């Protein structure tokens, strides 16, 4: 069996992370070039992620924690909740990266609200 592979799957994205949910939906998140937000895409196939619309789930703070270098998000589904783990820093110390968590308690992470859970 041969599979056509698109390289890259999604342009200008670093630290890609793909999760396949129990319903067969694939979710894609990655660092964006501006390092200022967390985006999510969903599709029924991995190839479909390339054309799926990116939805912004969260934007960086203007100052203080989570205000700079939003980096390497991962999406997970744990015990009925959606979680995104990502790295972020303070605009005054961009290399003091720390891990943070976003949570969605709804069933659809593309439409239901996300909330900040803070630093891990």
Locations of regions flagged by a protein language model:
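Carbohydrate-active catalytic/glycan-binding domains of CAZyme proteins
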Residues: 1-120
């Amino acid at each position: 069996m041969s599979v056509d592979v698109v390289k890259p799957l999604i342009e200008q994205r670093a630290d890609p992370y793909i999760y396949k949910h129990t319903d067969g939906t694939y979710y894609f998140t990655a660092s964006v070039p501006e390092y200022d937000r967390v985006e999510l895409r969903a599709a029924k196939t991995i190839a479909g992620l390339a054309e799926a619309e990116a939805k912004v789930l969260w934007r960086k703070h203007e100052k203080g924690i989570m205000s700079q270098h939003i980096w390497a998000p991962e999406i997970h589904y744990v015990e009925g909740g959606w979680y995104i783990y990502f790295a972020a820093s303070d605009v005054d110390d961009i290399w003091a990266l720390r891990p943070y968590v976003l949570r969605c308690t709804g069933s659809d992470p593309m439409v239901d609200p996300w909330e900040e859970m803070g630093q891990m």
